[in-house]
């Protein structure tokens, strides 16, 4: 056929022309030119209209725009010239030539207009133009080649060549980013947003990140900012709106709503996933075509077809690389959005919970563990349906090769799928049990870490350590059932891919043999089928794991939905506004004064609120109301009628457990109103909880919080709350960090910082729930006078102040008093004088009304006569040192790994279990890989004599499959069931031991959330993610080595490239890991403050809602979540870059092998070529898996690194000399000698200075002093919680510096200021943590502290302690009851009666006299009357020095001029008598 006739036919192949390796001209013009041009002409108007209507000008005019215009004009000129050439050509024009040329001219004009609009109105390169120009260049190049080969119309060929070159230049120009030309407001957009389609395909937008990460330490601020659709506020609004409209009737409503709100990003994943499937199943056809071509006679003149095969392999593998990267990256984008939505919703819901329903641990588990499972499940969700499609296609193609034998893998697949679906339900149930066990352990651990001073003082370290370790062992035991199910699931997943080829080849061979030998298993059929089995294996295994992972995420969705459907707190109050604005700043404080910078969060709070005056002149009015925490139970308080007058001081008093705190929470709307009503003049008030609530931050941040910053007002508040002198002792003053829950602060300081926050907020109403209990009398007088005296700042502001107090000495100064009687029914109210006239709690208080009490302020001098001892400054200094150390350590180690970490991991497991695992994996991989060689031998034997020794070849093949399953189960069992409990127990024990042995300065300097992360997130990684990563990484590593060997066997010259391949892989991995490790560290670090804020919010719900800070905290949460999303998203994004690069490397290997096949035709056996090509397909998959598993392992091994650093870097409080074991009866008497004792935190300044004191057996000793004088330090020294720098302490003849510290703490009895009870545990366990006491003994102790009736009313000793709903004072009484049960002759009370009223204080003193009559008692006292009446000796401390010592009556007799104790007593007595 001549060329002219050939090109006028449709073709598509030009048979007989140009070597048969070309398309016809008609086909090229009608299929390659016209359609793509028509698509441009259709798309361009819509795109241009959209940009002009929806977008503003984004790019400044520049030379680059003019370059694009010039290129467009050149293209138009070349297209016109091309049309002219066609019209002048007498030959070889087709019926499509002129229409195609004319359309191209129109397209050139369209390109000119669209290029201008895209350049000016879009901040990214045009996707429409880039795609059109890309395909147009490829298709035009094909047509240009045809024209050159024709040779009939050289001018047309030249103009076509010029047009193609111009399009290449246009494509280059349109591809370049416009960031340098963007207007200033758009230049900070994320790199991904401003990148073009090719940058997205090949992830080149990440290269700046790799450059910085390779050579520098990355910071979150240096990462790409989030684009709009990832912003948590946007995502929350999106989900919240849809969730509000959802019916919420089914278990999966939340899942459906999330899908509805993110429908577009989720559905966009489908197209690249389908393209990936298409490219994947091109591979068997390429193998078949390559083997057929290789088996032909080497003299055949068809080398062009060989070149075509090279091009086909290249295009298919490039297509696989791009589509893999795109569908995985789009999946990560959708997953990131889901994460942002759910975490935002969880926080929003948590901030709406009632205070009784708020469980920090349960909520945090949802935010951490469940969100992680959803993340994992959603990243594989699209694989579930895609794997089914892949299975169907693979089976169909197998049917074309093996006939009915293809039904074997179908049956195997159905068996695997059905078995997996059945197993998934059991997996979910076991997983839920495991998560609950984790939650229980973390709850107890978190509580212990938050109260370490109480734990150590009570001698509970060993008891709690044993209990928590037992919970850990129980947790691992429960998880064992889950792990065994995972192995069963894995066996189901691998049975089909391993045995399907065996059974299929056997069935095919037997059928072919029975049919007379038709369809012999030759090389082509064997290896084409084997490639299909390889492609079938991946979706079969992936389907099972993806389905399991997705169903696990569905279970987490159900758990989160249940949480979101939890009843929110209901504010039953009636809020009445009068339209006035709240009072302004105090007089003399000008808004023009110098202020500290205002954060965006603080700006959101700079608004006025309605006044505190209701229409009837009262701040609150309670009318016949009943309050309770559970509407289905008896009210805690009932029939309450009371008023809170506006602008007055109201005191709420009553016995311990009478419901004072409940009444305050009712005023805040935190407790349900079962009947009656509460009228409030304002929805927000300043509130100080009985247990001070603090967020982790500086003193300044804690006080100012979200109020308007004003420096003069701030300084005035510090002075009023007697904090200035405390701040001078902190290393950074008010910029010192106070730690989690204010751990760095002493009890009194914590209460005063909380009080300062309430005063600073300048709310019209302040509620103070027993905030003076932790202050010494002198400091209390000063603070009370400064705030509530006749000229106190709260009086000047006309603030409504409600004070709950267990001390009645302030009653005469109250304008109004509400008195609860302890029965829970009714109350009395009125002025002090009025209440004194009737029979009630006030009249029984024996407090008289001095003249002018309410008009005259209690007199007091400064809060302290000398600077307080810096008891917490050492902790703050330790914190500073730790921050610097961690910073240096992180900077040095983030970008690189450490082989020592892997050694540390293996040591925790044991070398023998590790070697068993390694040998089992190697055996498994051998049995997996060798069958390829075996099949080559079988095919070669079949070629010589069909069906020869069929049983022999099938039997060995089946045996190898069975052995691979056996070794797979053995290796997986060894890792998941045997090695995980070993490492899990060892690491937890190391962490727990480190924490229990850590000094108190560690807990002051280290955020509790960071330590909890070691016990939760890191151990979770070690329990599941790390072992699976290690298993997958090592197995895939050995498999890749085996496949490289097989590729080299099949195409031995390829082995020459392997060293270069390995070097390239090392460079890529090295470059990648230096960035990915940092991103992983940043991901974990960014989660810690997010989790910390979540926990702080849940524990401080009453406070933050009272202040009206919910919105401000939610804004802060959005900022932290957005900060967390950046490394989270980019970590997965850089993994996609790595996947793409690896795919490119595999593409090079595949092309190299095919090039060798074509160039060495006839020299390579077809069977070995098949071995090489099949293994290339598998190597492509496994190399990506290896690098993914390896990088995942490298990030997961960070958990081991952090634990290793934590255990090695955390100092132990124990000293080498502390080895002496005291006699079992020690101490037997109770004598204590302080001999010139100086003590402090490690190398810090002494907080006790040269203390000498002798306490005889049975003496009752009271320790007095101003706040910060060293009282708690003296107790801490006795319990060895601070270190001796000089001197010694002798207890019953033994120097305690030689005795193990925990031994001392278990031999002495300590009652801490903050009562420590183990929530979630029974009353019996809390009363008798060590066990061994009878129920009668426990009952006797609880009766003594008047708590037995509460215990019996709630179910007895086996009732959980939190079900008793003990008040703060009752919790202290419980601890005293626990002290009664311990027989030690030494009892130490650290302000144990700070939160009880006078009656209970008298009860405690009576118990000291009666139950501790033969014991030595050391008590820190603030109530000096108690020291006068109940103690044999008083020790007065000042600035860490022993000021004086003696019998209280003797010291008092010396008079205030000669005695510090007498001076302190007189300063209190001159105002008001103490309680009796």
UniProtKB/Swiss-Prot annotation:
ATP binds at residues 654-661, 1265-1272. The keyword Transmembrane applies. InterPro entries: AAA+_ATPase (IPR003593), ABC1_TM_dom (IPR011527), ABC1_TM_sf (IPR036640), ABC_transporter-like_ATP-bd (IPR003439), ABC_transporter-like_CS (IPR017871), ABC_transporter_C-like (IPR050173), ABCC_6TM_D1 (IPR044746), ABCC_6TM_D2 (IPR044726). The chain crosses the membrane at residues 23-43, 64-84, 97-117, 156-176, 266-286, 305-325, 384-404, 407-427, 485-505, 532-552, 906-926, 950-970, 1021-1041, 1045-1065, 1137-1157, 1167-1187. It is a multi-pass membrane protein. Glycans are attached at residues 2, 624, 682, 696, 798, 836, 1250, 1414. It is found in: Cell membrane. Pfam families: ABC_membrane, ABC_tran, TMD0_ABC. Residues 586-615, 842-870 are annotated as: Disordered. Residues 274-552, 916-1195 form the ABC transmembrane type-1 domain. Keywords: ATP-binding, Cell membrane, Glycoprotein, Membrane, Nucleotide-binding, Transmembrane, Transmembrane helix, Transport. Residues 855-870 have a biased composition (Low complexity). Residues 622-847, 1232-1464 form the ABC transporter domain. ABC-type transporter; part of the gene cluster that mediates the biosynthesis of the fusahexin, a cyclic hydrophobic hexapeptide with the amino acid sequence cyclo-(D-Ala-L-Leu-D-allo-Thr-L-Pro-D-Leu-L-Leu) that plays an important role in cell surface hydrophobicity. This is ABC-type transporter FG02316. The lineage of its organism: Eukaryota, Fungi, Dikarya, Ascomycota, Pezizomycotina.
């Amino acid at each position: 056929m001549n060329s002219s006739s050939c090109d006028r036919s449709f073709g598509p192949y030009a048979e007989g022309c140009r070597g048969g390796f070309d398309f016809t001209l008609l086909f090229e013009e009608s299929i390659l030119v016209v359609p793509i041009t028509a698509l441009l002409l259709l798309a361009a108007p819509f795109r241009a209209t959209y940009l002009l209507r929806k977008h503003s000008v984004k790019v400044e005019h520049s030379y680059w725009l003019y370059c694009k215009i010039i290129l467009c004009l050149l293209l138009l000129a070349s297209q016109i010239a091309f049309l002219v050439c066609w019209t002048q050509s007498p030959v070889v024009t087709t019926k499509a030539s002129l229409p195609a040329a004319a359309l191209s001219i129109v397209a050139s004009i369209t390109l000119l207009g669209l290029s201008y609009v895209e350049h000016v109105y879009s901040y990214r390169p045009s996707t429409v133009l880039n795609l059109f120009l890309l395909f147009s260049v490829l298709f035009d190049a094909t047509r240009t080649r045809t024209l050159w080969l024709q040779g009939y119309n050289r001018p047309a060929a030249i103009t076509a060549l010029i047009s193609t070159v111009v399009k290449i230049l246009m494509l280059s120009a349109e591809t370049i980013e416009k960031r340098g030309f963007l207007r200033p407001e758009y230049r900070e957009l994320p790199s991904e947003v401003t990148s073009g389609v090719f940058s997205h395909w090949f992830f080149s937008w990440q290269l700046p990140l790799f450059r910085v990460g390779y050579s520098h330490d990355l910071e979150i601020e240096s990462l790409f900012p989030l684009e709009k659709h990832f912003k948590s506020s946007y995502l929350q609004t999106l989900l919240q709106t849809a969730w509000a409209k959802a019916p919420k009737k089914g278990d999966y409503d939340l899942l459906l709503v999330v899908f509805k709100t993110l429908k577009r990003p989720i559905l966009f994943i489908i197209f690249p996933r389908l393209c990936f499937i298409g490219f994947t199943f091109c591979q068997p056809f390429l193998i078949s075509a390559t083997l057929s071509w290789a088996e032909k006679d080497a003299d055949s003149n068809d080398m062009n077809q060989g070149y075509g095969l090279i091009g086909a392999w290249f295009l298919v593998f490039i297509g696989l690389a791009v589509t893999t990267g795109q569908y995985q990256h789009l999946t990560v984008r959708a997953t990131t959005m889901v994460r942002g939505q759910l975490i935002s919703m969880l926080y929003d819901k948590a901030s709406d919970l009632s205070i009784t329903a708020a469980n920090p641990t349960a909520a945090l588990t949802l935010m951490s563990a469940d969100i992680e499972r959803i993340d994992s499940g959603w990243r594989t969700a699209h694989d579930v349906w895609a794997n089914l499609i892949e299975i169907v296609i693979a089976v169909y193609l197998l049917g074309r090769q093996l006939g009915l034998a293809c039904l074997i893998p179908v049956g195997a697949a159905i068996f695997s799928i059905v078995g997996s679906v059945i197993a998934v339900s059991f997996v979910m149930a076991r997983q839920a049990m495991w998560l609950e066990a984790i939650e229980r352990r973390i709850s107890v651990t978190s509580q212990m870490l938050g109260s370490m001073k109480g734990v150590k003082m009570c001698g509970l370290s060993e008891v709690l350590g044993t209990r928590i370790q037992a919970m850990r062992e129980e947790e691992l035991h429960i998880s064992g059932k889950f792990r065994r199910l995972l192995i069963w699931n894995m066996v189901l997943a691998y049975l089909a891919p391993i045995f399907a080829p065996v059974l299929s080849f056997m069935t095919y061979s037997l059928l072919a043999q029975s049919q007379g030998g038709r369809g012999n298993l030759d090389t082509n059929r064997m290896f084409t089928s084997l490639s299909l089995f390889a492609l079938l294996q991946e979706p079969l295994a992936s389907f099972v794991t993806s389905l399991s992972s997705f169903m696990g995420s569905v279970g987490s969705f159900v758990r989160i939905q249940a949480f979101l459907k939890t009843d929110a707190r209901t504010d039953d109050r009636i809020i009445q506004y009068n339209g006035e604005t709240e009072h302004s700043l105090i007089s003399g404080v000008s808004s023009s004064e110098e202020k500290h910078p205002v954060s965006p969060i603080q700006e959101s709070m700079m608004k006025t609120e309605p006044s505190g005056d209701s229409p009837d002149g009262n701040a609150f009015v309670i009318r016949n109301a009943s309050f309770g925490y559970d509407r289905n139970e008896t009210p805690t308080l009932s029939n309450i009628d009371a008023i809170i007058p506006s602008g007055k001081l109201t005191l709420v008093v009553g016995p311990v457990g009478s419901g004072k705190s409940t009444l305050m929470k009712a005023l805040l709307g935190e407790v349900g109103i079962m009947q009656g009503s509460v009228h409030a003049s304002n929805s927000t008030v300043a509130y100080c909880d009985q247990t001070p609530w603090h967020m982790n931050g500086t003193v300044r941040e804690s006080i100012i919080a979200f109020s308007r910053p004003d420096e003069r007002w701030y300084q005035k508040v510090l002075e009023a709350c007697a904090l200035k002198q405390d701040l001078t002792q902190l290393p950074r003053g008010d910029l010192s960090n106070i730690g989690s829950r204010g751990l760095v602060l002493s009890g009194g300081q914590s209460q005063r910082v909380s009080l300062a926050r309430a005063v600073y907020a300048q709310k019209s109403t302040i509620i103070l729930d027993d905030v003076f209990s932790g202050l010494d009398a002198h400091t209390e007088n000063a603070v009370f006078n400064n705030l509530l005296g006749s000229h106190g700042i709260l009086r000047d502001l006309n603030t409504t102040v409600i004070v709950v107090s267990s001390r009645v000495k302030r009653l005469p100064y109250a304008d109004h008093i509400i008195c609860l009687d302890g029965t829970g029914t009714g109350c009395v109210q009125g002025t002090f004088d009025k209440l004194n006239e009737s029979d009630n709690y006030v009249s029984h208080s024996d407090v008289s009304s001095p003249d002018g009490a309410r008009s005259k302020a209690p007199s007091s001098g400064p809060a302290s006569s000398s600077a307080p001892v810096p008891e917490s400054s050492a902790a703050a200094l330790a914190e500073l040192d730790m921050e610097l150390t961690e910073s240096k350590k992180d900077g040095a180690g983030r970008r690189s790994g450490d082989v020592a970490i892997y050694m540390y991991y293996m040591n925790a497991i044991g070398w023998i279990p590790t070697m068993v695992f390694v040998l089992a994996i190697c055996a498994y991989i051998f049995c997996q890989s060798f069958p390829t060689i075996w099949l080559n031998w079988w095919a070669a034997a079949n070629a010589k004599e069909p069906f020869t020794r069929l049983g022999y070849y099938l039997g060995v093949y089946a045996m190898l499959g069975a052995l691979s399953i056996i070794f797979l189960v053995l290796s997986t069992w060894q890792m998941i069931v045997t090695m995980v409990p070993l490492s899990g127990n060892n690491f937890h024990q190391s962490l727990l031991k480190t924490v229990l042995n850590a000094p108190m300065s560690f807990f002051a300097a280290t955020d509790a959330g960071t330590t909890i992360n070691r016990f939760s997130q890191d151990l979770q990684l070690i329990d599941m993610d790390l072992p699976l990563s290690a298993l997958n990484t090592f197995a895939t590593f050995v498999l890749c080595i085996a496949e490289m060997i097989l590729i080299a066997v099949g195409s031995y010259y390829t082995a020459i490239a392997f060293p270069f391949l390995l070097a390239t892989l090392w460079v890529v991995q090295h470059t990648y890991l230096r960035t990915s490790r940092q991103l992983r560290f940043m991901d974990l670090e960014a989660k810690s403050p997010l989790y910390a804020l979540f926990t702080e919010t849940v524990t401080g719900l009453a406070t933050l809602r009272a202040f009206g800070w919910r919105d401000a905290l939610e804004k802060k949460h959005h900022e932290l979540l957005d900060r967390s999303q950046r490394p989270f998203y980019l970590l997965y994004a850089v993994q996609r870059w790595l996947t793409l690069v690896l795919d490119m490397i595999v593409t090079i290997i595949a092309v190299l092998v095919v090039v060798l096949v074509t160039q060495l035709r006839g020299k390579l056996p077809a069977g070995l070529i098949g071995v090489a090509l099949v293994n290339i397909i598998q190597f492509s998959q496994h190399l990506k898996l290896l690098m993914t598993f390896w990088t995942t392992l490298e990030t997961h091994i960070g958990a081991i690194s952090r634990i290793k650093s934590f255990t090695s870097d955390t100092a132990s409080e124990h000293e080498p000399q502390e080895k002496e074991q005291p006699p079992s009866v020690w101490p037997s008497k109770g004598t204590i000698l302080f001999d010139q004792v100086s003590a402090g935190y490690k190398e810090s300044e002494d907080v006790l200075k040269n203390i000498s004191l002798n306490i005889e057996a049975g003496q009752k000793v009271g320790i007095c002093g101003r706040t910060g004088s060293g009282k708690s330090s003296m107790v801490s020294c006795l319990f060895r919680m601070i270190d001796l720098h000089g001197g010694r302490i002798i207890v019953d003849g033994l120097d305690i510096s030689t005795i193990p510290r925990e031994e001392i703490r278990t031999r002495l009895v300590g009652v801490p200021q903050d009562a420590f009870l183990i929530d979630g545990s029974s009353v019996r366990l809390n009363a008798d943590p060590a066990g061994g006491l009878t129920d009668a003994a426990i009952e006797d102790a609880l009766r003594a502290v008047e708590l037995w009736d509460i215990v019996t009313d709630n179910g007895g000793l086996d009732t959980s302690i939190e079900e008793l709903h003990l008040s703060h004072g009752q919790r202290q009484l419980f601890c005293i009851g626990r002290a009664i049960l311990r027989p030690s002759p030494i009892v130490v009370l650290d302000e144990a009666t700070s939160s009880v009223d006078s009656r209970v204080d008298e009860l405690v003193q009576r118990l000291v006299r009666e139950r501790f009559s033969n014991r030595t008692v050391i008590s820190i006292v603030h109530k000096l009357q108690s020291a006068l009446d109940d103690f044999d000796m008083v020790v007065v401390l000042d600035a860490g020095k022993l000021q004086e010592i003696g019998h209280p009556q003797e010291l008092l007799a010396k008079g205030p001029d000669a005695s510090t104790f007498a001076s302190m007593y007189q300063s209190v007595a001159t105002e008001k008598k103490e309680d009796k």
